[in-house]
């Protein structure tokens, strides 16, 4: 019997690169060799949607996207509020796996980390992984709003039935913040590469 797929979100981050033939590169992170799902593979950042990703608290920390607006983009989720959860999960998982966070202190510019903030947010990542803090609590504590309106819904894919671990994944595309750098956590991810879509 096929495994039931879990709801998940994936974020394809792009950056402008003048010397690239296509003009853009996309981010891939390498999954840890001991990961249960696709060990050692280069993938887009992403993971399972959690209940906390579509609570009222989650809606409050989103900029430019409400439960209703998310449902207009992604219909048919159960419960309906889960539509927003896909957006939040894409940002949260990218933060956990790549250290990049699409969020504002003051719009319209996505935050840039100072050296002190890099250290602080690295600690936050460890605390989120250990369930010491929720992602939403960190966002509120830092006075941030998630840049959910900068995520463009791109595709919906379900892992084939032959896989013992399956995901019902929504894919999003966004521009990578120019003043943040990828920091793999050595737990979920061990390396990264920016690569031309042609490859």
Q: What are the functions of these language-model segments?
A:
Residues 1-199:
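N-terminal leader/linker segments that precede catalytic domains of diphosphate-processing enzymes
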């Amino acid at each position: 019997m096929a495994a039931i797929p879990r709801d998940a979100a994936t974020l394809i981050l792009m950056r402008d690169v003048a010397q690239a033939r296509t003009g853009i590169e996309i981010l891939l992170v390498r999954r840890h060799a001991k990961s249960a799902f696709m060990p050692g593979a280069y993938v887009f950042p992403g993971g399972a949607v959690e209940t906390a990703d579509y609570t009222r608290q989650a809606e409050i920390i989103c900029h430019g996207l409400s439960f209703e607006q998310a449902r207009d983009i992604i219909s048919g989720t159960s419960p309906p509020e889960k539509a927003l959860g896909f957006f939040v999960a894409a940002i949260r998982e990218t933060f956990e796996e790549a250290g990049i966070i699409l969020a504002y202190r003051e719009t319209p510019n996505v935050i840039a980390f100072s050296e002190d903030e890099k250290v602080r947010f690295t600690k936050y990542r460890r605390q989120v992984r250990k369930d010491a803090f929720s992602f939403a609590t960190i966002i509120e504590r830092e006075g941030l709003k998630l840049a959910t309106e900068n995520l463009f819904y791109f595709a919906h894919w379900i892992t084939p039935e032959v896989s013992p671990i399956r995901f019902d994944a929504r894919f999003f595309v966004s521009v990578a913040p120019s003043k943040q750098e990828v920091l793999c956590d050595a737990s979920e991810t061990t390396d990264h590469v920016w690569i031309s879509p042609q490859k």
